[in-house]
Amino acid sequence: MSGDHLHNDSQIEADFRLNDSHKHKDKHKDREHRHKEHKKDKEKDREKSKHSNSEHKDSEKKHKEKEKTKHKDGSSEKHKDKHKDRDKEKRKEEKIRASGDAKIKKEKENGFSSPPRIKDEPDDDGYFAPPKEDIKPLKRPRDEDDADYKPKKIKTEDIKKEKKRKLEEEEDGKLKKTKNKDKDKKGAESDNKKKKPKKEEEQKWKWWEEERYPEGIKWKFLEHKGPVFAPPYEPLPEGVKFYYDGKVMKLSPKAEEVATFFAKMLDHEYTTKEIFRKNFFKDWRKEMTNDEKNVITNLSKCDFTQMSQYFKDQSEARKQMSKEEKLKIKEENEKLLKEYGFCVMDNHRERIANFKIEPPGLFRGRGNHPKMGMLKRRIMPEDIIINCSKDAKVPSPPPGHKWKEVRHDNKVTWLVSWTENIQGSIKYIMLNPSSRIKGEKDWQKYETARRLKKCVDKIRNQYREDWKSKEMKVRQRAVALYFIDKLALRAGNEKEEGETADTVSCCSLRVEHINLHPELDGQEYVVEFDFPGKDSIRYYNKVPVEKRVFKNLQLFMENKQPEDDLFDRLNTGILNKHLQDLMEGLTAKVFRTYNASITLQQQLKELTAPDENVPAKILSYNRANRAVAILCNHQRAPPKTFEKSMMNLQSKIDAKKDQLADARRDLKSAKADAKVMKDAKTKKVVESKKKAVQRLEEQLMKLEVQATDREENKQIALGTSKLNYLDPRITVAWCKKWGVPIEKIYNKTQREKFAWAIDMTDEDYEF
């Protein structure tokens, strides 16, 4: 029963009895006396509230007897019309009492007896409201209303003065409350500003703390807005001309669009390559009208200069945009991201990685790809397959178009797919690396690599035994597995000839790719590797191998031509099947992941010195990371701006050295003054100069470490191994152990990708 309801009932009944009190003044005093007694009884009851339910019943009986006495005293003096009012009040009181008794009875039936609370007692006497501490109304107008209600008395001068004083106090209290509220409001606003990032962190989905879905099930609900298509082609201005054989020629819109793709790349090395030019011209002619085909027969006679200059000017104009123009573009992009860049997966908002469909253009490929220069066609809604859940709203295609297909497959992770025209491969729109699906896949990958740790010795013993096998196929497989384990080579995939660049992996090594040296640079049994690896990046390495491996390689190369396969009895299918037999889920990539992660962990233990400062520890980490990148052949060409950035860094180092020399001279001078003066002021100056020297020494060391790091990493790509092959928990544990801020190792994107590892890893984690 609510406190307001009890209060109202007691108020009505009190007013009702007040009318009789004017007629019976003597009885009024008696009632007041009884009221005080009752109040005392109630306070005692409250103190004894921890006693048994039987005591509660006794107190209620006494309470009811008092009520009967009161009713008898009042009824003898009342008029007939007031009897009816009183009967109504009685019925109301009985209902209240009945509800209170029922509650107590219910508690008894449930097998427990709770101590009586004032909140649960029926307000039978009608003279006062229940005390503040027991009844908690939702809202009360002011503090004074919470005091016990007292029967009305005939007003006297003292009462009037008291009331006036209370009103004044109340006004003062209200003013104070208003001021406090304003302060609280301001404080709350400032707190909200401070706490905003925390709130965002709290909202991050900690999927790693939840139970995983059954094997094969990727999601239960998926809804998204579909892809964003490339904008339609905008024809060139009239002033931008295309020339063929020295004459102006107006191209049809389709032919002009493809011509602009070549014009944009005119200064690039690609446009000088014969295969690129040949493929481009062939596909461009397909887009021409018959008249254009008859005229344009030789690419060398085409002049794209004005087109190229127009796009350069456009690029320069974008760079010279005002802040307002740049802000407007940024806002438009953010609006697009907000609408299309997120999906709802299992009641969580997940970021989409690539929601924009790639615009049409010319295919470049990796390395010397045989299809470079071919036209990548514009993708239309009719090429698109949408994947979402059955109960989700299917995204609407652009007006006048329709989707190729809508699927509801929760065993795949892609949202949108289409087939590109160059290689016939399927392209996908997937979730961001920070999503649950990608995070779970990463976690599983590193856990599989950790499982390999338990059986790697057994596998190594097995392939060593197989080096002596009578079967040539088994020997070749064992040597290939040794290279995958020791050198982190890729197993390779089956390729169609002429479809891709001539890149080589372990199973596709040819005789021409290795040289055997019984002795080289003071080492025995050295194998020299030289072949184009993934993305046509050269793999060059001189590795000392075990004697039996060297002898087997000599055997495999017997009576073979340079272009013949080294492992002629082996392919990736045979090797991968063998790996699966050794351990469930084992692939060449698992070996690379295992060797990369274990190398990082070992290198960090060797290189990290406990007494080093943070910049020195970061240098140690990068050196450990570099060892992994070299193992995995993660190379890169030195950045174009490398020399310039190194010169700038060296200038900073030289300037810092000059500052340090000046600071040391100042310190020496201050020490000399302190010896002569011998006062507190000069001592303070010396301390200040000392701190300045220390600060400059630290700054100089940071710059020198940075220069060393850049020089060592100019041709090594650390990011590839950090993102794809190194268990992030090794890095997180190292950071926590040595007090290195995780922000110094992982950037914002990487921290989002590895949020699961950052949250769950302690400093004592071992791979």
Curated annotation (Swiss-Prot):
Its EC number is 5.6.2.1. Residues 434-767 form the Topo IB-type catalytic domain. GO terms for biological process: chromatin remodeling; chromosome segregation; circadian regulation of gene expression; DNA replication; DNA topological change. Residues 1-23, 40-110, 131-168, 181-201 have a biased composition (Basic and acidic residues). Sumoylated. Lys-119 is the main site of sumoylation. Sumoylation plays a role in partitioning TOP1 between nucleoli and nucleoplasm. Levels are dramatically increased on camptothecin (CPT) treatment. Residues 24-39 have a biased composition (Basic residues). There is a cross-link at K105, K119, K155 (Glycyl lysine isopeptide (Lys-Gly) (interchain with G-Cter in SUMO)). There is a cross-link at K119 (Glycyl lysine isopeptide (Lys-Gly) (interchain with G-Cter in SUMO1)). One of its GO terms (molecular function) is RNA polymerase II cis-regulatory region sequence-specific DNA binding. There is a cross-link at residues 103, 105, 119, 136, 150, 155, 160, 166, 174, 206, 338, 551, 644, 702, 714 (Glycyl lysine isopeptide (Lys-Gly) (interchain with G-Cter in SUMO2)). The modification N-acetylserine is found at S2. Its main location: nucleus. Belongs to the type IB topoisomerase family. Releases the supercoiling and torsional tension of DNA introduced during the DNA replication and transcription by transiently cleaving and rejoining one strand of the DNA duplex. Introduces a single-strand break via transesterification at a target site in duplex DNA. The scissile phosphodiester is attacked by the catalytic tyrosine of the enzyme, resulting in the formation of a DNA-(3'-phosphotyrosyl)-enzyme intermediate and the expulsion of a 5'-OH DNA strand. The free DNA strand then rotates around the intact phosphodiester bond on the opposing strand, thus removing DNA supercoils. This is DNA topoisomerase 1.
